[in-house]
Amino acid sequence: MVRKIGLALCILFLVGCGKYTMEEAKENGDIIVQNGVENSDRFESFLKKSKQGKSDQIRITAYTIEGDPILYDVKYNGKTYQYSSDASRDQFRSTEDDRKNEVCQQLDKTIVKQEAIYTLRQCAEGTDHELLRLPK
């Protein structure tokens, strides 16, 4: 009986550790997407630095309806962008779309209606990656 309780507590602990809370994301300076965008000024700073050819990196954390985080890491090295996505914390995940350090050549801004859409293009695996939509 004690073993079963110990096992149950261990499982609960491990499940709890796998969650990346919104509070953690805020503390880490992530750009947060859930019913809008929080910390968009960090994205603007990233854009400015990349236009100047300066290295920088960001994390965009998007939360699903269920509250599960999907992480998007973008690093700029002065020439190209490295893109990684991680849906491992999403209970309904499709890890076939996860990427690890995929190289993309450019970050484009497209205006559609009242939104600025930022997309990584010319990526090594042949797929563009939409990063963020901000009000114009």
Give the residues covered by each predicted segment:
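Serine/threonine-rich low-complexity intrinsically disordered regions
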Residues: M1, T21, E38-R42, S88, ...
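Sec-dependent N-terminal signal peptides of Gram-positive bacterial secreted proteins and lipoproteins
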Residues: M1-T21
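Compositionally biased, low-complexity repeat tracts
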Residues: L12-L14, A25, I32, V112, ...
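N-terminal export/targeting and maturation segments
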Residues: C17-T80
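Extracytoplasmic electrostatic interaction patches
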Residues: I65-K136
